[in-house]
Amino acid sequence: MTGRKEEELEGVTLLGNQGTTYTFDYNPDILEVFENKHQGRDYFVKFNCPEFTTLCPMTGQPDFATVYISYIPDVKMVESKSLKLYLFSFRNHGDFHEDAMNIIMNDLIKLMDPRYIEVWGKFTPRGGISIDPYTNYGRPGTKYEKMAEYRMMNHDLYPETVDNR
């Protein structure tokens, strides 16, 4: 197997950049992609993001979560450093938990057009309650549409032990 050629990495500008700028305001333009070299195969790419923060739109108080992103790529894949910076850009963004997870998923669909994607936010309790929004998408008219329906119906069938994180 050979490594990636320089021209395959033209759109990847943040990885390896020592002068990284952290944006504190929501910015989907930070996201970068590269080509999937294994388009003939279905496989999951999973990201665990344990330090996600956003703001409550009513009180301005911070909300903390672990965000799980899993997707089956088609042609394009999200570059991980750009994803990290994108998620960091939610730091001063005020939205409800459910909205934030759907915004993330919609931005990634627009960026990559994956075969399948799911985004799950596990927020720490605030006011005595934790909220864990789950959202997913399967490309319409394909087996991934049925997969999304199945995973939606079964995603929390055997929930983990809640330990107040």
Swiss-Prot record:
UniProt keywords, alphabetically: Cytoplasm, NADP, Oxidoreductase, Queuosine biosynthesis
Record GO biological process: queuosine biosynthetic process; tRNA modification
Pathway membership: tRNA modification; tRNA-queuosine biosynthesis
GO molecular function: preQ1 synthase activity
Annotated localization: Cytoplasm
Enzyme Commission number(s) of this protein: 1.7.1.13
Active site location: 56 (thioimide intermediate), 63 (proton donor)
GO cellular component, one term: cytoplasm
One Pfam family matching this protein: QueF
List of residues binding substrate: 78-80, 97-98
Catalytic reactions on record: 7-aminomethyl-7-carbaguanine + 2 NADP(+) = 7-cyano-7-deazaguanine + 2 NADPH + 3 H(+)
Organism superkingdom: Bacteria
Reported function: Catalyzes the NADPH-dependent reduction of 7-cyano-7-deazaguanine (preQ0) to 7-aminomethyl-7-deazaguanine (preQ1).
Entry's family note: Belongs to the GTP cyclohydrolase I family. QueF type 1 subfamily.
Annotated protein name in UniProt: NADPH-dependent 7-cyano-7-deazaguanine reductase
The organism of origin for this protein: Halalkalibacterium halodurans (strain ATCC BAA-125 / DSM 18197 / FERM 7344 / JCM 9153 / C-125) (Bacillus halodurans)
Lineage: Bacteria, Bacillati, Bacillota, Bacilli, Bacillales
Gene transcribed to yield this protein: queF
